[in-house]
Regions:
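Glycine-rich phosphate/pyrophosphate-binding beta-alpha loops
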Residues: 1-7
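C-terminal helical "tail/cap" subdomain of flavin- and related membrane-associated enzymes
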Residues: 3, 18-97
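A general alpha-helical scaffold signature found inside nucleotide-binding enzyme cores
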Residues: 8-11, 30
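Extended, folded domain segments that form the structural surfaces/walls around functional sites
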Residues: 10-19
Length: 97
């Protein structure tokens, strides 16, 4: 569902490099202290998107007719909503840092 690992690794590097630069330039630890929370917030958003794409594009044997109708409604909404298309594009290429 989009190979999110590489995007997440790049964002980890972004957050870590900022934290290390701040620490070694001025001794500031604020970014270092927030590093895990900042990364995890982004990771869970990517995880949510991957889960959503999987449920949108795959069918599972344990799901019944109701879920099939929900999946079709979601696909219909996705194909007709500019806002939804923008959201999926933003998530697919990687959320802003």
């Amino acid at each position: 569902t989009g190979a999110k690992g590489l995007n997440l690794a790049a964002s980890d590097i972004y957050y870590l490099s900022r934290a290390l630069i701040a620490y070694y330039q001025s001794g500031a630890t604020e970014l270092m202290d927030r590093y895990s929370a900042d990364c995890l917030r982004r990771i869970w958003k990517a995880e949510r998107f991957s889960w959503w794409m999987t449920t949108l594009l795959h069918t599972f044997p344990q799901e019944g007719p109701f879920m099939a109708k929900m999946q079709n409604a979601e696909l219909d909404y996705l194909s007709s909503s500019t806002a939804m298309m923008s959201a999926i594009a933003e998530n697919y290429v990687g959320l802003p840092y």
